[in-house]
Amino acid sequence: MNAEAIQTPMTVDVKADDKPYFDAPSKMSAKNVSVFYGDKRAIDDVSIEIPQRYVTAFIGPSGCGKSTFLRSLNRMNDTIANARVEGEILLDGEDIYKSGMDVVQLRARVGMVFQKPNPFPKSIYENIAYGPKIHGITGSKAELDEIVEQSLRRAGLWDEVKDRLGDSGTALSGGQQQRLCIARAIAVDPEVILMDEPCSALDPIATARIEELIDELRGRYAIVIVTHSMQQAARVSQRTAFFHLGKIVEYGKTSDIFTNPREERTKDYITGRYG
């Protein structure tokens, strides 16, 4: 990073629809959440509101806990034997860690797109159809065809694959595979989409397409994205949370975080003094 960047806070384009925070209804809420791996505390007493139809970015240095916290929002940490979560995480006011919670159904409501594209070793069609089938969303082939088409359209992939739906999803390019994974997530009609470094394995052209897609999708979903790229956070999000050492140091409008941070540690990070 050059000397000028170190001296000057990052500039971001403020979108016209970037309304004040209190105008955005909360979709998910975390209250005093801590995450442990055995005796190690990875997340320490984090509270945050995730607004509906906004993109919320989690930024911070490697190992700061942002991906761990993201995974707690749909209980992906349950797959780790020694992990445990304390505190409350609410989806529309319901504690997702309560006894009796249907975790499979939760993960349909709160979908996940991972860092590396992970299409199933199935056809493009079956990659999208799999979720609606196992969740009993549709009972007819015609309805399933419609879900597949609409999901691929929303992911900006339909025109590229409509004539080869029987081809393997793994034969697509990296950027296409990631859009296929996004289409797979939205095929079960989620309410929240979590994205863990979704562009880190993609080239700049594919990254730009995914960022355009994120902006299009936020009109329907609450989206939370973990990114190491502050430029990407500035481009795609309306809210940004800066994590450091397992805590949220600062959370607010993206334009404020990057141009007028309240906390000195936030300013130091976004101006490249550490991280």
Curated annotation (Swiss-Prot):
GO terms for biological process: phosphate ion transmembrane transport. Transmembrane segments: none annotated. Its EC number is 7.3.2.1. Residues 28-270 form the ABC transporter domain. SUPFAM superfamilies: P-loop containing nucleoside triphosphate hydrolases. One of its GO terms (molecular function) is ATP binding. InterPro entries: AAA+_ATPase, ABC_transporter-like_ATP-bd, ABC_transporter-like_CS, P-loop_NTPase, PstB-like. It is an enzyme of class 7 (translocase). It is found in: Cell inner membrane. The keyword Translocase applies. Part of the ABC transporter complex PstSACB involved in phosphate import. Responsible for energy coupling to the transport system. The complex is composed of two ATP-binding proteins (PstB), two transmembrane proteins (PstC and PstA) and a solute-binding protein (PstS). This is Phosphate import ATP-binding protein PstB.
